[in-house]
């Protein structure tokens, strides 16, 4: 009887440790960016004051038209130039490109560089608001 009780306690302890270990292994908070809609990005632009709009298209594409107050940094230059252009890694950064593909790549690269508040909102092709040249 004592042996059965001891085995039961050991089994419960082992299962508890296994459950805790499993929870801990799945609780890996990986940093990531947030994908938002153009409408959500516009709301942020209209209501917030402390943010950066980052256009990750080429210089030529940027010159053809961009969102007002956007800063241009080609997505291919993120890893080499982002820290000089964007020194505050906690700043809210709104990222876009032409169609949404490059902005996702750029947003991911920014997160890998340690930026903590990155929101990607697709491409200027889907931007229904003002564009400046």
Residues of each region from the PLM?
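Hydrophobic beta-strand scaffold positions of dinucleotide-using enzymes
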Residues: 53-55
